[in-house]
């Protein structure tokens, strides 16, 4: 089983983004399928990819604290495909700032027993994410 946490930093202001709505969703259905690719030269290869046709089901909902952290998203998650959805539109509107991103979704695969820390660096018109520790 795995755990998930996140940290949102407002890079335009140079400080943590407090009060950002966050929800964790799990893909229901889908699964791994084999896809075969071929080239004009006649060579081919097969790879395992995740079938993304399943429905998204909410697992939990929270908001970032004063330090921009969300520590209570989930504990003991089974393996699967998940996404964290950040309500960046509301956060920026509350500060009278405009953005082209009403929400930002980070989709990731959770496999085995591990901790997944997925920070979001946010500004009005850009964002970056990475797997933290």
Q: Residue locations for each model-derived region?
A:
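Beta-strand-dominated extracellular/periplasmic modules and repeats
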Residues: 2-111, 117-119
């Amino acid at each position: 089983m795995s755990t998930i946490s996140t940290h949102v930093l407002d890079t335009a202001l140079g400080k943590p983004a407090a009060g950002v709505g966050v929800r964790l969703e799990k893909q229901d259905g889908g699964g791994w399928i084999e896809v075969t690719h071929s080239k004009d030269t006649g060579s081919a290869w097969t790879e395992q990819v995740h079938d993304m046709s399943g429905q998204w089901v909410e697992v939990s909902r929270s908001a970032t604290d004063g330090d921009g952290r969300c520590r209570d998203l989930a504990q003991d998650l089974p393996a699967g495909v998940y996404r964290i959805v950040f309500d960046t539109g509301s956060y920026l509107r509350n500060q009278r700032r405009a953005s082209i991103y009403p929400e930002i979704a980070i989709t990731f695969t959770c496999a085995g027993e591990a901790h997944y820390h997925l920070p979001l660096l946010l500004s009005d018109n850009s964002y970056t994410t990475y797997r933290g520790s």
